[in-house]
Amino acid sequence: MHKVQSLQDPFLNVLRRERVPVFIYLINGIKLQGEIESFDKFVILLRNTVNQMIYKHAISTIVPSRVVSYYVGRAGNHTTF
């Protein structure tokens, strides 16, 4: 059995590594802004004037401030968002 690679990990990693400013919309309508400092399976650490730990289950949408490209899967499929 092969391990299925997550789509969100490469996307979040590019945003973190390149320090791309993002807007994060929560399911309750709140809009947060900052740079992704770190993330794991359950949370994203967002840095602005303060650090905020955001649970992924509370997130509706993540919008980068610019176009980002990243690779997904073993075949190295190139994706632009």
Curated annotation (Swiss-Prot):
PANTHER family hit by this protein: RNA-BINDING PROTEIN HFQ
Family that this chain belongs to: Belongs to the Hfq family.
Native species: Blochmanniella pennsylvanica (strain BPEN)
Domain Sm per the UniProt entry, residue ranges: 9-68
Gene Ontology BP, a term: regulation of translation, ncRNA-mediated
Cited InterPro entries: Hfq, LSM_dom_sf, Sm
Signal peptide: none
The protein, known as: RNA-binding protein Hfq
GO cellular component: cytosol
Lineage of the species this protein comes from: Bacteria, Pseudomonadati, Pseudomonadota, Gammaproteobacteria, Enterobacterales
Subunit structure: Homohexamer.
Keyword Glycosyltransferase: no
One Gene Ontology term of the molecular function aspect: RNA binding
Record's keyword annotation contains Transferase: no
Function of the protein: RNA chaperone that binds small regulatory RNA (sRNAs) and mRNAs to facilitate mRNA translational regulation in response to envelope stress, environmental stress and changes in metabolite concentrations. Also binds with high specificity to tRNAs.
Keywords: RNA-binding, Stress response
Disulfide bonds: none
